[in-house]
Amino acid sequence: MKKILLFHTRYRITGGEDIAVDNEILALKKAYDVEALIFSNNEIDNIFKQIIYFLINKNSQSDKLLENKLNSFKPDMVYIHNTWFKASLGIFRLLKKHNTKFVIKLHNYRFECGRFFFKASHLKGNSFCSACGYHKTDTFLFNKYFKDSYIKSLLLIIYCKQYYKILKNSNVLTLSN
């Protein structure tokens, strides 16, 4: 039986993506040997470490857990959902190191909408982004993805720029308009 490792970071407030992941685990277990490596953005043990992990987009604790799971479970494929922020983008280096195939399920357009520093680049000449709801009147110049925080928005932009490179340089199947 094929082995699938499902990889996900839960949001602070449970929503549609977390519920979809739970349902997919149940469905996949009917046909595959499935194990899940689930992180939670509610579990922050050291805020200073998390800030460093944010800035370098690599969480050594999450990487170690994934490394152990890859060595013990030996999956045929890793099925990736949300990596923001606890899991981090460091997982892709590990998957490459282990020569492990992976599939990414994109539940939203955060990686696309959040990768620009300036709102003009995000909106691409439009007054409204149909993917995320951002409107040109939301901010003056900066692409403030999180309306309540410039800092969180900046951290997201750093993350999304790297995530977009990963998507661009991987064999990722996308549906385009």
Across the structure, where does each feature detected by a protein language model lie?
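Generic structural signal for helix capping and beta-alpha/helix-loop junctions
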Residues: 14, 44-46, 87, 112-113
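N-terminal subdomain of nucleotide-sugar transferases
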Residues: 1-42, 71-73, 91-101, 168-171
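A short, charged, and often flexible helix/loop element on the N-terminal side
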Residues: 39-67, 80-82, 141-155
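An aromatic- and histidine-rich active-site surface loop
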Residues: 79-100, 104-137
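Membrane-proximal helix-turn-helix segments that form the acceptor-binding/catalytic region
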Residues: 64, 97, 110, 121-172
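Short acidic/polar active-site loop segments enriched in Thr and Asp
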Residues: 76
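Amphipathic coiled-coil/heptad-repeat helices and related helical stalk/stem segments
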Residues: 21, 62, 87-88, 158-160
